[in-house]
Each structure stands twice: as structure tokens, then as C-alpha cells.
UniProtKB/Swiss-Prot annotation:
InterPro entries: AA-permease/SLC12A_dom (IPR004841), SLC12A_fam (IPR004842). Gene3D superfamilies: Amino acid/polyamine transporter I. This is Uncharacterized transporter C18H10.16. Its main location: membrane. The keyword Iron-sulfur does not apply. It is found in: Membrane. It holds the Pfam family AA_permease. One of its GO terms (biological process) is cell volume homeostasis. Residues 1-83, 134-146, 224-232, 317-334, 390-417, 464-480, 521-1050 are cytoplasmic. The chain crosses the membrane at residues 84-104, 113-133, 147-169, 203-223, 233-253, 296-316, 335-355, 369-389, 418-438, 443-463, 481-497, 500-520. GO terms for cellular component: vacuolar membrane. It comes from Schizosaccharomyces pombe (strain 972 / ATCC 24843) (Fission yeast). The modification Phosphoserine is found at S9, S60, S270, S901, S936.
Length: 1050
């Protein structure tokens, strides 16, 4: 018999190999939709670990080592004995003998056949899916769990593996209970038919099942070789026992035994017609009647053993070939056997015998030993297979280190890797399941197996629709429709049979997913969700190219350009709070003239930056580039960052590190440049590449940003940022929206220049301040506050009312603080504007600050010509058509930035841009105003702008005609007549007095004139002007915008 089985297995393998190489075409697809097929990946050579192991990515080393370290010297099994026989024997369940007659009597032949077709439809679709997954690469121990977890990730794969482990244990308990039932019916003291010597009773039966379970565990400890030898003999017994049922219906003479309630008619059409329909009886608990759902829950486990061969993957010679061949062949074989049994039993036994006689199979057989041997063989094999397969599965899960504390179960024997510890644990859990009866166990098994089958089909479906190039299984008989139908069918049947238990099963699976997600160390297995996300992301990114962004859905998309992330962590976190769930990119330039030599450094920096982002929980992308200098590198980042319609609209530049020079800008002044940068040398981290940058480069970068399409923000002082606290004194997010008017008029017609009101920047200050305030930490610990300036006291109330009206229009809730220059005791304002005495130290400080200001030097000359140098001076107001700088000063020394012009009521003048004879003439850095707008509603700005701004909007107001022969000595000097540096000094003093509790200050970035970067002196003076304004202030965010971001439209 053994030689016959060996020859049979050889013939089976030969035929299976021949069939597998045939070029067949799937009947459900057209020629162009055939799945791609590639040769199976070869097993790794012995030298792979020594030669290639050290070249693997760091994340995959531990996983690869754990998988490769297991011994491979044990005897491996072929397709027939390793997959076909286990699957066939596991499918031909003990339920065939113990519960099939009862199911046929309750549901009838037709509905029993329907159960058969539904069960095998689930089984066939699952077999196709698991075959496709297993033939896409090398399969190791763990079977279906290994294949699924490597396909859809450790979280979902691990939860499925644990649920399937529980299902196998419950199936083992059911088979052991079924194994003991015929023993009691044959040898029980009360119900024994052959001999009466075994005591009966609940605890006696429990003792018998415990002994059977212990014997199975002992056999499992002997290894898979013993299992293979035993399975061959058991296979012959079970096949003969199953075939004896239809043969008995033909050759056994009809009989009727009233004592046994059996009426055997032989094969008769009349008997089949009577048993065709269902006739449900009262259930065992007496709470209702049996139904299709309840009987299907008992029937399904009889067909659910299709993964038995896959569970033996660690003991197969070629799992990728054996699993699909053995599984599908076994499914076809067992389906035919079940079909014959249902038809023959339904056509030969009356309904009374089917319902009342649980041993009817034994009574109608040619000889009772056929059925008894089949029950004992099926129960023994299924019990052994369940324990051994479940233990191997637990061992595989433990070796993957998905849940802490399971490493103990990963141990195996030194020769053939027998999981002794896992077998012991499986024994204990199975022992607990023996307290339940067969019907309850079968219903729970149905839930666990259907859930496992559903997720196997789902994982294969996701792999197919992800269109991943590396998913090209050699098994060709599947497509996305078969996997989708298998998924829907599995989950649908699951909820149809028992909604409550199905929901509980999904809930347990979800809990396991969460647990594994938080406890499992990183795995380099890949995740099908990566392919799905990529596919969907690409589709939606293409759609963003078609849609034009509407101002109503504007949100900040930030590109933060930084040098060293360790020293700029505060500004990184600040921008992370500011992004409002949108795009956030960290950009960095590696300066190098040799691109190829810098690639290793680029890879190292990419790892460091990504690790930095992960460790800090920053939701940002990292974009690094190599360039000959910072200017070209940042140009490349700004022009290429983002993808599709998702591109940065705000470029954030940290303020220049002034450590390139080690001297003060003026002696004896409190304004020091040595420590003004938010990056401190002591905080540097040598693992990040960083470069000091000169003012000309920094200003050139800023000019490039200003002429581009993105808005600009410059940050300074964030190393001193005090993060808001939920408890304690409230801090402020201050808005200081200096409204600047830049003159861009033509030299040809100076009497009527064109003025561009930078209303976009004005509104951007409000928008970003409000967005920051919506972040949870900032909302709890900060309040919004608007700071605005007037020069005279009679303008305070009008300005406050105007600001409240504007905030209401913008739908922003904030405190309003109106500061009056004339009413405050400001040393700088008194000294510069009013020409009053101040402290000698203060006057010396101011003189040092203004010593290079040509306007101030001319002003001092004029003051020296006045009669009373201590009183207020008379000074001509600056007129728009009068080129004050050109008339009074050297044209070769133009200002480095357009002076700020405040809207301070009727006393305010607009200052025309200083004109120069430089190469750029009067060229503006920003695109023309009309080209910046994203819509054509010209009334929005006028409705949102403060009244004082609207009053000055006409050319007559902004550009009064020149009056020849005017007496300028009678004019009062006002804030608007000052040079830009003088205004910075006064603003610094007044803002500094009112920002003691300020966390962040949002204000306007004064733009440099075009080509300022071409002169080192001009660039340095521009940087100095900004430093003078920001000296001692809280962290500042200086903004320059070219597009409107606030709308009142619905």
C-alpha cells in the first residue's frame, strides 16, 4: 500500500507539473487582459547571507536574518503528501458523518446543495487568491499568514493570523469532540452497540477528549515526517469510508428498523422528492426553529479546511508550486465527494431517520466499520493537523515579533524546527475549547474562517488594483473580479449567518490591528496600502492640474528653507502649526561643485532629515538638493517643489545668520548683530550640513522670491519663542500690519504717478495670524491682538472704529490696540521728529544708528540753520511730484528699501519711491498689481480697506501738484516725512514697549529695491535696517504677499 501511494504521488506531481507549464487562457478575460506571468523567483543561494546580507537596508536586516537563520536540513514534502493529502483530509471533516444527515433532514436536499455551492464558491475564490499570492515569491513557514502579512502589512496580516490561529484551535476542539462521540456510542456502558465498558457522563467524556488531545500533541512533537507517514494511511481510510456511503446506497437492501427510527429505501426518486424541500424543526434549546442560517453555520466548517496545505508551507519543498496545485485539486476532489454523499443520502433515507438518528451513516453502510474507521481517522487527522498547523502558525507570528512577549513561542527544535513551546500553548487553549459542544464550536469556526478567507481575497484584490509592477504571480487563473467577488461573498455570508458574531469578529480584528500597530517594530515587508495610496494620489494630483484654485479654499502651503533643523526646531514647529492641514516642505541646499561626489552626503542627509521629522512628529516632506551655491539651490527648490496643483504658495526664509562678522554695527550701541540670528552656534549639530551665508546672497535669495509667484515670509528670533501654555498667563499673537504704499510711477510723468497699495500683504497678516490661533495649543494659550498706529490723539477713536469694522468684515475676533506716536513718551520720536532733548546715552545711540543716513545728515544741517534748535522745526512736506532725494542728495546713494508710509489720518502723506539712476531705473521687484489678482472684483479691496486708506486712493490725494516758492520752514515735520531707518527706530521703540507678553509678532516685510544684492554695502544696510526694526522684539514673522487670501463672498 505504501509503494502504491508513493507511485501515485509521483504520477500526481508529474501530471501537475505538465499542466502548470501549459499555456492556457483564462475563459473569463479577453486576450489583452490576461495576467502577466513570470518565472518563479529562485531560492537564495547558500552564499547570499554572507555576501549580500550586509548590503541590505538597515531596516530589513533583522527580519531577513530571523527568516534565514532557521535550519533547512529537515526532510521536505512534495505536493501530493504535503498539500493535497492534508487539504483533502482536513476538508473531509468529521461533520460529514455526524451532522450531514441532520442538515439534509432540516434544510432538504436543495438547500443543502445550495450550502455546498456557496461554501465551495467561497473556497474556490479563496484558493485562487491564496494561490496567486503564494506564487508571487518565496513562501516560508506560516502559510497563509506569511503570504498575507507580507502582502498587506504586519498590522492586518498579524490580526488575520491570530484570528486564523484561534479558528484552527476551535476546529481542533470540534474534531476531538467528534472523535470521542462514536467511541461512546460503540463502547459506552449505556449506549454502546458493540461493547459496554466505558463510563459515560459529561466529565468522563471530557477526560476522553483530554486524552485524545494529549496523544495528538505527542504525535505533533515527533515532527512532520511522522505526520506524512500517518496521513498517507489515514487518507486511504477516509477516502474509502467516504466512497462507501454512495456505494452502500446502491448495494444495501432497503430496510426499516423502528428501534433505530431508520427507514432505508435505497436509491429512490420518491425518497429524493420527499427530502427535496426543507422541514425545519424546533431547535435544541427550545427557543425557536432551526433555519437556513443555523444549519449553514454548522455546515460551513466541513468545507473550510482549504488552508491546511498552505499551513504546511514551511515543510514543503516548493511552496509556491505545491500550494496552488494541491489546494485547487483537493477542492475539486472533495466537492465531488460531498455532492455524491448529499444526493445519495437524500435519495435513500427518509426524513425521520435523517433527523432522529445521529448514527444513520453507520446503520446504512455496507459495514459499520467503514463509517467508524472514517470518523476515527478524520477526527484523529484533523485534530493532529489542527494542533500542528496552529503551532506552526503561532511560531511564525512569534518570529515576526509582532506583539511583545511572544518571542518565547518562536523556538523550534535544532533538527526539523518543531515548535514544542507553541504546541504546548496550543494544547492548553484547545483544552479550554473542549467545554463547548460541537454545534457552538462550528458556528464560531464559521466566523473565524470566513473572516480569514475574506481578508485573503481582499489582500489579493488590493494587490491587483494597485498595479504594482512586482506583483506578477505565476498562477494565472485569477483577476480583480474573482478576488472582489470572493471578498464580498466571504463577508456577506459571514454577516448573513450571524450578524452579532460577525460584528464581534471584526471588532476583535480591529483591536488586534491597533495593538500590533503600536507594539510592532518597523518591518520592511511592504504594504499594499502604499500602492493603493500612490495610485489614488496620482489620480487626484492630475485632477488638481485642471482645477483653478479659488480664493475661498486658499490655505497656506509652506516651503520652509532652513540651514540646520536642530537649531531651527522652533521655527519648524511654528510652521507646522501654521500649515492648516496643507502642504509643508522642509527645504535645504547642500552646497557643492561636484554633484557626483556629494551623492553620498545627500543620502546621509536625507536619512537624518527624515529621522528628524519622524522623531519630532512634524507633518512635513523633506526636499534636499545639491547646487553650486545657495542662490541656485533655492531657486531650484522654489521652482520645483510640490507636485501637480499642490505647490508651495508661501516660501519661508529664516533671517540671515549675522555671525559672519564679529563686530557691532556701531560702537557703544545696544543694537548688536552678533546674537540676532535665531540659530546659535552653540546649538549646532555637526551631523547636519550647514553654511554661513553673506548678506548679498541672502538679499539675492529674497529678491528672487519677491519676483516669483510665491508669497514670502522672513522669520527672526524664534530661538526665543515661548510656546503657549494651556494654563497660566495668556500670551498674544500680535498683528502689526503696516500698510505700505510703494511708488512705481514713471519718470516721464511724475505729476501723476501710479501707486500700488499692498493690500494683499495687509490681509495676509490677518489671515496667517488667525490660522496660527486655530492650532490647539495656540488657541488655548494665546489671544489675537491687532496693533495699529496713529500720530495724533484726535485720530485714535476713528482708527479704533475702523479697525473693529475691518476685523468684523474679516470674521476675526481680536483685541485692538491703537498707539499714538505723539501721546507716548518715545525718545526716538521726540529726538527725531520734535527735535527735543533726550538722555545723552539715548541721543548718542540714535546718532550712531543714523550716522550713515543721508536724510538725517541733511536734516541736521537744516536744524542747525534754525533760530531755536530746541523747538519744533519747520520742514517742507514731501510732495509726490517732487523728487526730494534727487534734489537734495547724491543720486549714487539711493535708499536700500522703500520707506514705510503709514496711513495716519489727514496728516499723512504718501512717499513716492526714491528714484535712482541705477541700471534698473524705477523697476519694481513684484509683478504689477493687476496681474496678481485672482479675480476681477475691484470692490472687495475698497470695502475691506480702512477708511483712511480709501481716502488716499485718488491720485489727487496722493500726488498733489508742486507749489513753487513755498515756505518750507513753516511746515511741521511728521512721521511720514522721515527716512526709512528713522521710521524703523521709532517703530522698534513703540512696539517693544507693548509686546512684553507677545508670543509671535506678524508684520510686513519691507521689500528691497531691485538689484540691491549687487552691492555688498547696500545689502548690508538693508539687513541692518531690518535688524534695527526687530531688535529686542519677540519672534517676528515678516510677510510680503502678492495675492489676496481673504474674501467676503459666500
Amino acid at each position: 500500500m505504501a509503494r502504491l501511494l508513493t507511485k501515485s504521488s509521483q504520477v500526481f506531481d508529474f501530471l501537475a507539473d505538465r499542466l502548470s507549464v501549459r499555456k492556457s487562457r483564462r475563459f473569463w478575460e479577453t486576450q489583452e487582459n490576461l495576467e502577466s506571468s513570470t518565472p518563479l523567483l529562485q531560492e537564495p543561494q547558500q552564499s547570499y547571507r554572507s555576501n549580500s546580507f550586509n548590503e541590505l537596508p538597515p531596516l530589513s536586516r533583522s527580519v531577513t536574518f530571523a527568516e534565514n537563520e532557521q535550519p533547512n536540513e529537515a526532510v521536505k514534502l512534495g505536493t501530493f503528501e504535503g498539500c493535497f493529502i492534508p487539504t483533502t483530509l482536513n476538508v473531509l471533516s468529521i461533520l460529514l458523518y455526524l451532522r450531514f444527515p441532520w442538515i439534509i433532514g432540516e434544510a432538504g436536499v436543495l438547500k443543502t446543495l445550495l450550502m455546498l455551492f456557496i461554501s465551495y464558491a467561497v473556497g474556490i475564490f479563496t484558493s485562487l487568491s491564496i494561490s496567486a499570492i503564494c506564487t508571487n515569491g518565496m513562501v516560508r513557514g506560516g502559510g497563509a499568514y506569511y503570504a498575507v502579512s507580507r502582502s498587506i502589512g504586519p498590522e492586518l496580516g498579524g490580526s488575520i493570523g491570530l484570528i486564523f490561529y484561534v479558528g484552527q484551535i476551535l476546529n481542533t476542539g470540534m474534531n476531538i469532540s467528534g472523535f470521542v462521540e462514536p467511541i461512546i456510542s460503540i463502547f459506552g456502558k449505556e449506549s454502546g452497540t458493540i461493547s459496554q465498558f466505558l463510563p459515560e457522563g459529561y466529565w468522563w467524556v471530557f477526560l476522553y477528549t483530554t486524552c485524545v488531545l494529549a496523544m495528538c500533541c505527542i504525535l505533533c512533537c515527533l515532527g512532520s515526517a511522522i505526520f506524512a507517514k500517518a496521513s498517507n494511511a489515514l487518507f486511504v481510510v477516509i477516502i474509502l469510508s467516504t466512497i462507501s456511503i454512495p456505494i452502500s446506497s446502491i448495494f444495501v437492501h432497503p430496510f426499516k428498523d423502528p428501534s433505530l427510527l431508520v427507514h432505508f429505501t435505497g436509491l429512490k426518486w420518491s425518497t429524493l422528492m420527499k427530502n427535496l424541500a426543507s422541514a425545519y424543526t424546533e431547535n435544541e434549546k427550545g427557543t425557536g426553529y432551526e433555519s437556513f442560517k443555523s444549519t449553514f453555520g454548522v455546515f460551513f466548517p466541513a468545507t473550510a479546511g482549504l488552508l491546511a496545505g498552505a499551513s504546511m508551507s514551511g515543510d514543503l519543498k516548493a511552496p509556491s508550486r505545491s500550494i496552488p496545485k494541491g489546494t485547487i485539486s483537493s477542492q475539486a476532489t472533495t466537492f465531488l465527494l460531498y455532492l455524491l454523499v448529499i444526493l445519495c443520502v437524500g435519495a435513500s433515507v427518509t426524513r425521520t431517520g435523517l433527523l432522529l438518528d445521529m448514527d444513520v451513516m453507520e446503520h446504512i453502510s455496507l459495514h459499520p466499520l467503514f463509517i467508524i474507521s472514517g470518523i476515527l481517522s478524520s477526527g484523529a487527522f484533523s485534530s493532529f493537523m489542527g494542533i500542528f498547523g496552529a503551532a506552526k502558525l503561532l511560531q511564525a507570528i512569534a518570529r515576526d515579533d509582532l506583539i511583545p512577549g511572544m518571542f518565547f513561542f518562536a523556538k523550534g527544535s535544532s533538527y526539523d524546527d518543531i515548535p514544542y513551546v507553541a504546541i504546548g500553548v496550543t494544547y492548553l487553549i484547545t483544552q479550554i475549547s473542549l467545554f463547548w459542544d460541537i454545534n457552538m464550536l462550528s458556528s464560531m469556526i464559521t466566523m473565524t474562517f470566513l473572516l480569514t478567507f475574506g481578508f485573503i481575497n481582499l489582500s489579493c484584490f488590493l494587490l491587483r488594483i494597485s498595479s504594482t509592477p512586482n506583483f506578477r504571480p505565476t498562477f494565472r487563473y485569477f483577476n480583480r473580479r474573482t478576488t472582489l467577488v470572493g471578498t464580498i461573498l466571504s463577508f456577506g455570508v459571514m454577516f448573513y449567518v450571524d450578524r452579532l458574531n460577525a460584528f464581534i469578529s471584526f471588532l476583535i480584528a480591529g483591536i488586534l490591528v491597533v495593538v500590533i500597530y503600536f507594539t510592532c517594530p518597523p518591518k520592511n515587508w511592504g504594504d499594499v496600502s502604499q500602492g493603493i495610496i500612490y495610485h489614488q494620489l496620482r489620480k487626484y494630483l492630475l485632477q488638481t492640474n485642471k482645477a483653478r484654485e479659488n480664493i475661498k479654499f486658499w490655505r497656506p502651503q509652506i516651503l520652509l528653507l532652513i540651514n540646520n533643523p536642530n537649531r531651527s526646531e522652533n521655527v519648524i514647529r511654528f510652521c507646522n502649526s501654521l500649515k492648516k492641514g496643507s502642504l509643508y516642505i522642509l527645504g535645504h541646499v547642500i552646497v557643492s561643485d561636484d554633484f557626483q561626489a556629494s551623492m553620498d552626503d545627500l543620502r546621509k542627509q536625507q536619512r537624518l532629515w527624515h529621522q528628524f521629522v519622524l522623531d519630532r512628529g512634524i507633518k512635513a516632506f523633506v526636499e534636499l538638493t545639491i547646487a553650486p551655491d545657495e542662490v541656485w539651490g533655492i531657486r531650484g527648490l522654489i521652482s520645483s517643489a510640490g507636485l501637480g496643483g499642490i505647490r508651495p504658495n508661501i516660501a519661508v526664509l529664516t533671517f540671515i545668520n549675522t555671525n559672519y562678522r564679529r563686530h557691532r554695527i556701531y560702537s557703544g550701541s545696544s543694537f548688536s548683530l552678533e546674537n540676532t540670528s535665531e540659530e546659535s552656534e552653540s546649538d549646532s549639530k555637526k551631523e547636519f550640513v550647514e553654511h554661513d551665508i553673506l548678506p548679498v546672497k541672502w538679499v539675492q535669495i529674497l529678491e528672487d522670491m519677491l519676483v516669483g509667484s510665491v508669497d514670502v515670509m522672513v522669520t527672526n528670533g524664534f530661538d526665543r519663542l515661548n510656546w503657549p501654555k494651556r494654563k497660566g498667563e495668556k500670551q498674544y499673537i500680535d498683528m502689526f500690519p503696516i500698510h505700505r504704499i510703494s511708488g512705481v510711477g514713471s519718470e516721464v510723468n511724475e505729476s501723476t504717478p501710479t501707486f500700488a497699495t499692498n493690500f494683499e500683504t495687509y490681509t495676509m497678516v490677518f489671515q496667517l495670524s488667525w490660522i496660527l490661533h486655530t492650532a490647539s495649543d495656540w488657541k488655548q494659550g494665546c489671544r489675537l491682538r491687532l496693533i495699529t498706529l496713529v500720530e495724533f490723539e484726535n485720530e485714535i477713536e476713528a482708527e479704533r472704529e475702523s479697525m473693529h469694522q475691518m476685523l468684523e468684515t474679516f470674521r476675526i475676533k481680536a483685541d485692538v490696540v491703537v498707539l499714538c506716536l505723539a501721546a507716548m513718551n518715545l525718545d526716538a520720536y521726540r529726538y527725531i521728529v520734535k527735535n527735543e532733548h533726550v538722555r545723552p546715552s539715548k541721543s548718542s545711540e540714535l546718532e550712531n544708528l543714523l550716522k550713515d543716513d543721508s536724510w538725517w545728515q541733511e536734516e541736521k544741517k537744516r536744524r542747525g540753520n534754525t533760530v531755536d534748535s530746541l523747538g519744533p522745526i519747520r520742514f517742507p512736506r514731501r510732495m509726490s511730484g517732487y523728487n526730494f532725494r534727487s534734489a537734495s542728495f547724491d543720486k549714487s546713494a539711493p535708499p536700500l528699501s522703500v520707506p514705510l508710509s503709514f496711513r495716519l489720518g489727514p496728516h499723512m502723506h504718501s512717499v513716492k519711491s526714491f528714484e535712482t539712476e541705477s541700471s534698473f531705473g524705477n523697476r519694481s521687484l513684484s509683478p504689477k498689481q493687476e496681474n496678481r489678482r485672482t479675480y476681477s472684483d475691484s470692490t472687495i479691496e475698497s470695502s475691506l480697506m480702512p477708511n483712511v486708506v480709501r481716502e488716499d486712493s485718488s491720485s489727487d490725494r496722493l500726488a498733489p501738484k508742486k507749489k513753487i516758492g513755498r515756505d518750507y520752514s513753516k511746515e511741521k515735520l511728521t512721521f511720514n516725512d522721515l527716512s526709512s531707518r528713522s521710521q524703523y527706530i521709532i517703530m522698534n521703540e513703540i512696539v517693544l514697549k507693548h509686546t512684553k507678553n507677545t508670543s509671535v509678532l506678524f508684520t510686513v516685510l519691507p521689500a528691497p529695491l531691485a538689484d540691491t544684492h549687487k552691492s555688498f554695502r547696500k545689502s548690508e544696510e538693508y539687513v541692518d535696517d531690518l535688524l534695527i526694526f526687530m531688535e529686542g522684539l519677540p519672534p517676528c514673522a515678516l510677510i510680503h504677499s502678492k495675492s489676496l487670501t481673504i474674501t467676503t463672498a459666500l
